[in-house]
A protein has these predicted regions:
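Hydrophobic transmembrane signal anchors and adjacent membrane-proximal interface regions, especially
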Residues: 7-8, 50-55, 98, 131, ...
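Structural motif
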Residues: 30-32, 54-60, 100-107, 133-139, ...
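C-terminal partner/receptor-binding element of secreted or periplasmic proteins
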Residues: 132-165
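N-terminal, charge-rich interaction modules
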Residues: 24-87
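Sec-dependent bacterial lipoprotein signal peptides
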Residues: 1-24
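Mature extracytoplasmic domains of secretory-pathway proteins
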Residues: 64-132
Length: 165
């Protein structure tokens, strides 16, 4: 009985340290994330004019804060600055081939930013048939994002970012 408690306590302590290490893992810098996205672009080899747009946050808490701000700003002032920057990368996709590689370490922030950017770009152009969107995120795109990309007539390719070292 005492051995079981000791094993259980040791396992709980190990789990606590693993969770602490995961929570404290620092996200890649903007330069590192940009390099990762360019490496993924080289691997995928999308056709068209290549544009790389990183979606980054200082920490998981910063990502949640940006999501909350985007929701409030979206209702009052339109899309966030990150979404507007990404929407500019989609320009010309209604008539030319454009490959946009975008993403970052936080799935929810990636998803919201890309959906907002697509909505913003589709206000100008109903269809963006020349767009290949390489979505780099820890989680697969949601059905809502897939539907938005399909409505735009664009191609969606998902890749997961490399694990932090």
């Amino acid at each position: 009985m005492a051995r079981d408690r000791a094993r259980l306590g040791g396992a709980a302590l190990g789990l606590a340290f693993a969770l602490l290490a995961l929570a404290c893992a620092t996200p890649p810098s903007d330069e590192e994330l940009d390099a990762q996205l360019r490496a993924i672009a080289a691997e995928v080899k999308p056709r068209g004019e290549l544009r790389v747009v990183s979606i980054n946050a200082e920490s998981r808490m910063d990502a949640w804060t940006k999501l909350a701000e985007d929701e409030v700003q979206g209702k009052e002032h339109g899309a966030s600055q990150q979404a507007r920057r990404l929407a500019r990368a989609f320009e010309k996709a209604n008539r030319l081939r454009v490959a946009v590689v975008t993403g970052g370490p936080y799935a929810d922030l990636n998803e919201q930013t890309v959906r907002s950017a697509l909505d913003l770009a589709m206000e100008k152009h109903q269809r963006m048939a020349g767009l290949t969107l390489v979505f780099v995120s820890p989680e697969a795109p949601t059905p809502e994002l897939r539907a938005t990309v399909n409505r735009a007539g664009s191609l969606l390719v998902h890749r997961t970012p490399p694990l932090p070292r």
